[in-house]
Amino acid sequence: MARKPPPIPKTHERTPGPRGQDTKANNELFLQEVFNTTNKLRGMHGCPALTINAELNKIAQEWANHLRDKNAMEHRPNPKFGENIFLSGGMDVTGDLPVEMWYREINSYDFQKAQFAPTAGHFTQLIWKGSKEMGSGVARKADRTWVVCNYNPPGNVVGQFKDNVPPKK
C-alpha cells in the first residue's frame, strides 16, 4: 500500500497575483513567503531559523533569471552553496508552494539510515540544521515560475546527516 504524503501545514492564505507578472512588489511578497515557510518547516524539526543573506539573494536571483532566459531547469554547476530549484507551469504559484514541494520529499528520507537519498535531497537541504542563512530568487515568464534558494553553509554533506536532519518533534 502506497504511503500517503503527510499534510503540509499552511502558513497562510493569499490570493495569487496575475500570472507572469514579474514585478518587484510581487517578487518581494513571494520571497517573504518562501522565507517564512522555510523557517516554519525547519522549526517543526527543531532546526534554527535561517537569516536572509543579501549576497545569496543576488546569486539565487541571477540563477533564476538564467533559468528563465534559457527556459531550463538545471542546478548551477559547481555551486559553493546548497541549492534547491523549482519550476512550475500553468498555474499561479505562491511562495509557500516550492518549499512545501521540497518538504514532501520527507517521505523518501530514511531517518534510521541518515544518509543522502537522491529522492530526498531538496528536503534534507531545506531542513539541514547546519545551514544558517539563505537567499532566494524568483523569475517568471508567461505561465512559468522558476524559484532558486541557496543555503550557507551548504547541506547534504556525507557523514553529517544524523546530526543535521532531525525527525519532526
Segments (PLM) and residue ranges:
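Poly-acidic low-complexity segments
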Residues: 7, 26-27, 52-55, 110, ...
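Membrane-targeting and insertion segments and their boundary/processing signals
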Residues: 16, 30-34, 72, 106, ...
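Short, well-ordered surface patches within globular domains
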Residues: 20-82
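Low-complexity, intrinsically disordered flanking regions
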Residues: 1-19, 169
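Intrinsically disordered, low-complexity regions enriched for glutamine and histidine
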Residues: 10, 19, 73, 120-123
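Disulfide-stabilized extracellular recognition modules
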Residues: 78-81, 89-169
